[in-house]
């Protein structure tokens, strides 16, 4: 070895160790200056993004200010798309009750708009634990035919991988009825299901549990009425 080997030694010393991972940048909330600009001048989409940022970092005062701003940014009347964007932004701001207020500014007719409106109304009611309003939204979505809800999959959360978690709207309606203190209505809803196999077995097991405390005669009448439908 001689002087000619020194550059190689220096290069090896300077190289990062094998397998060393780069340190990810530290996530920080929106700066105060940027937040104030969005609060005063931002549109609905910018306010919604600010809500998500404030919620991520637990900044409750920012959430409060953003909620107040979202209630004023698009005064009635507004077209359907604006009302829905405003309502979704309030939901992102953890204000489900205010979401319902904004939704009440627009009454959609039959069709896709009504479906979208009802689904967002259900989402807000579910977030607010407003069981009666959640029941109303799903029953209106069913439009008199509970079997429609059997194959209607609604997003109820996210997996650890960030993938959407879904549940049948029929099962969700039964849960809302049960949470509202109406087990007999929950039984009727569950028996409206048409999905066979494991799902049917699970629902029948739940029905059996709900019927157990009831008088046998009342239980039989309820089963007959549900099956007749």
Please place each PLM-identified region on the residue numbering.
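Alpha-helical solenoid repeat scaffolds
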Residues: 18-229
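Bacterial N-terminal signal peptides
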Residues: 2-15
């Amino acid at each position: 070895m001689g002087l000619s080997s020194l550059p190689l030694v220096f290069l090896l010393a300077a190289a990062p160790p094998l397998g060393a991972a780069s340190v990810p940048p530290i996530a920080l909330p929106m700066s105060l200056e940027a937040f104030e600009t969005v609060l005063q001048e931002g549109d609905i989409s910018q306010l919604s993004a600010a809500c998500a940022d404030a919620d991520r970092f637990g900044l409750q005062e920012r959430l409060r200010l953003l909620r107040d701003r979202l209630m004023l940014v698009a005064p009635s009347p507004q077209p359907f798309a604006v009302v829905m964007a405003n309502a979704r932004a309030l939901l992102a701001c953890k204000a489900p009750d205010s979401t319902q207020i904004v939704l009440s500014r627009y009454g959609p007719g039959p069709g896709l708009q009504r479906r979208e409106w009802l689904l967002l109304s259900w989402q807000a009611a579910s977030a607010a634990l407003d069981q009666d309003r959640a029941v109303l939204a799903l029953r209106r979505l069913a439009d008199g035919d509970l079997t429609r809800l059997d194959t209607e999959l609604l997003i109820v959360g996210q997996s650890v991988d960030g993938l959407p978690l879904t549940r049948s709207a029929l099962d969700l309606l039964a849960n809302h009825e049960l949470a509202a203190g109406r087990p007999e209505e929950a039984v009727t809803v569950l028996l409206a299901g048409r999905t066979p196999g494991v799902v049917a077995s699970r629902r029948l097991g739940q029905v059996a549990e709900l019927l157990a405390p009831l008088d046998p005669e009342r239980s039989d009448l309820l089963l007959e009425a549900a099956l007749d439908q």
